[in-house]
C-alpha cells in the first residue's frame, strides 16, 4: 500500500524531473520596484501591483484606520453580522468606476469566479470559454455542471460556429473570457464578443483582473460596452485583496443569495476593505497614474522591436521550462527579477518570461532590462 508521504514524494519527483516543481522563496517588498530575496536586492518586473498602491501612504493609512475602528476581522459571513458599512462603500466605488448599478465583493478573484458562474449556470445550460481563460474560470464552469464549449483564443469566428451549433440545445448560455489575458497580455475583443453573445441570446462575462486600474483610464477592458457581468480582483492594480462582480442590482442580489463562495465565507477584513476604497479613490482621480504601466510596457517593446503592448504584461516565449528558468537566472544575476512561467500555468511548449510593468518603474531601468534581454537572451536564442 502506498503511504500518503510516498505518494507526495513520487509526485514531487516527477515535477522535479520536468523542471516544473515550484518552491516558495521569502521575498521582502518595499515601496517602489525594489525587493530583496536571498540577500540580493532586485528590481522586480514580476509584480501585479501595477500602480504600486499596496505601499501608497493613503492606502496604508486607510487600512490602519479601518482596523482600529472595525477590528481585525469581519467576524462572520456578510449575510449574518459581517456586513459592516465599509463593504457597502466599497461596492459603491466599484459600481461607480465600472458604471454599473451594483457590485458584490468576494474573498478573492478565485472565489468570485467559482461562486458567480455556478450561481447562474446549471446542467441545462451551456458555457463558451476562451481556451486561454484563467484557471478560476475553468473551475467555476466545471462546478456549474453546464455543457462546456471551448473556442480558440480570441477567435470570434470559432465562437460564432460553436454558438450556432450548441446554443439552441441549452436553456441559458454564457460566454466567458479574460478581459486582459494574464499570461499573454493581449485583450479580448470585448465589443465584438458582446455583439456576438447578444445575437445568440447569451450573457457575456469578462474577468478584468488585469484590466481594472490600467486599461481605459482605470475603468478596465469592458469600458464603453454594456457587458452584463464584469468580474475582477482587488489584488492587482488596486493593491489590496479580494474579488468582485459588477452587474445590475437584481443580478448582484441573486449572487448574494446563491453564490456559495459568498454565502459561506466570512467577509473580508475591514483593513482590506478600507485599503481598497482608498485605492479606488486614487484610481478614479489620477488617469496619468493609470496610464503609466502600459506606457512603460510599450517603451520596453519598442526597445526590443516587439509589437506594441496592449497591457502592462509582456510575454517572451522561450519554449521549454528549462530555457525559461535559465533566462530568469541570467536576469536575476544582473539584478532583475522576471518570473519564468511554466506549464501547467501556460500550455506545454510555451514556457516564457512574463514581464509585468508598474507605474513606478524608472525609464533607465526599463532600458537596461531591454538591453540585457537583447544581448543575453534574444541574441543567444
Curated annotation (Swiss-Prot):
Organism: Acidiphilium cryptum (strain JF-5)
One Pfam match: Aminotran_1_2
Pathway the protein acts in: Cofactor biosynthesis; biotin biosynthesis
Broad enzyme group: transferase
Any one GO BP annotation for this protein: biotin biosynthetic process
Regions annotated as coiled coil: none
Function: Catalyzes the decarboxylative condensation of pimeloyl-[acyl-carrier protein] and L-alanine to produce 8-amino-7-oxononanoate (AON), [acyl-carrier protein], and carbon dioxide.
Alphabetical UniProt keywords: Biotin biosynthesis, Pyridoxal phosphate, Transferase
Family to which the UniProt record says this protein belongs: Belongs to the class-II pyridoxal-phosphate-dependent aminotransferase family. BioF subfamily.
PROSITE patterns: AA_TRANSFER_CLASS_2 (PS00599)
Positions annotated to bind substrate: 22, 134, 345
Cofactor(s) recorded in Swiss-Prot or TrEMBL: pyridoxal 5'-phosphate
Annotated catalysed reactions: 6-carboxyhexanoyl-[ACP] + L-alanine + H(+) = (8S)-8-amino-7-oxononanoate + holo-[ACP] + CO2
Subunit organization: Homodimer.
Residues binding pyridoxal 5'-phosphate: 109-110, 182, 207-210, 233-236
Protein name per the record: Putative 8-amino-7-oxononanoate synthase
Amino acid at each position: 500500500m502506498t503511504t500518503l508521504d510516498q505518494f507526495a514524494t513520487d509526485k514531487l519527483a516527477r515535477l522535479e524531473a520536468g523542471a516544473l516543481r515550484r518552491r516558495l522563496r521569502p521575498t521582502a517588498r518595499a515601496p517602489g520596484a525594489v525587493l530583496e530575496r536571498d540577500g540580493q536586492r532586485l528590481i522586480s518586473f514580476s509584480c501585479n501591483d501595477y500602480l504600486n498602491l499596496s505601499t501608497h501612504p493613503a492606502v496604508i493609512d486607510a487600512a490602519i484606520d479601518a482596523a482600529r475602528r472595525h477590528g481585525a476581522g469581519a467576524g462572520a459571513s456578510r449575510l449574518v453580522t459581517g456586513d459592516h458599512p465599509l463593504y457597502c462603500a466599497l461596492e459603491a466605488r466599484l459600481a461607480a468606476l465600472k458604471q454599473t448599478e451594483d457590485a458584490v465583493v468576494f474573498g478573492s478573484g478565485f472565489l468570485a469566479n467559482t461562486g458567480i458562474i455556478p450561481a447562474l449556470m446549471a446542467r441545462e445550460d451551456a458555457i463558451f470559454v476562451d481556451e486561454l481563460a484563467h484557471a478560476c474560470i475553468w473551475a467555476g464552469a466545471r462546478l456549474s455542471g453546464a455543457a462546456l464549449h471551448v473556442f480558440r483564443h480570441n477567435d470570434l469566428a470559432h465562437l460564432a460556429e460553436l454558438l450556432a451549433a450548441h446554443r439552441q440545445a441549452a436553456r441559458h448560455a454564457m460566454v466567458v473570457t479574460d478581459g486582459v489575458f494574464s499570461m499573454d497580455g493581449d485583450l479580448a475583443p470585448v465589443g465584438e464578443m458582446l455583439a456576438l453573445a447578444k445575437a445568440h441570446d447569451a450573457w457575456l462575462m469578462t474577468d478584468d483582473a488585469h484590466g481594472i486600474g490600467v486599461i481605459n483610464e482605470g475603468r478596465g477592458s469592458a469600458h464603453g460596452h454594456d457587458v452584463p457581468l464584469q468580474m475582477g480582483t482587488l489584488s492587482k492594480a488596486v493593491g489590496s485583496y479580494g474579488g468582485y462582480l459588477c452587474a445590475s442590482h437584481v443580478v448582484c442580489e441573486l449572487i448574494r443569495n446563491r453564490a456559495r463562495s459568498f454565502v459561506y465565507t466570512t467577509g473580508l477584513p475591514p483593513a482590506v476593505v478600507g485599503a481598497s476604497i482608498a485605492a479606488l479613490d486614487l484610481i478614479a482621480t489620477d488617469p496619468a497614474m493609470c496610464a503609466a504601466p502600459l506606457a512603460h510596457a510599450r517603451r520596453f517593446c519598442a526597445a526590443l522591436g516587439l509589437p506594441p503592448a496592449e497591457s502592462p504584461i509582456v510575454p517572451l516565449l522561450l519554449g521549454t521550462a528549462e530555457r525559461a528558468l535559465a533566462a530568469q537566472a541570467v536576469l536575476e544575476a544582473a539584478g532583475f527579477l522576471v518570473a519564468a512561467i511554466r506549464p501547467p500555468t501556460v500550455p506545454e511548449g510555451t514556457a516564457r518570461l512574463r514581464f509585468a510593468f508598474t507605474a513606478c518603474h524608472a525609464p533607465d531601468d526599463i532600458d537596461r532590462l531591454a538591453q540585457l534581454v537583447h544581448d543575453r537572451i534574444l541574441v543567444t536564442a
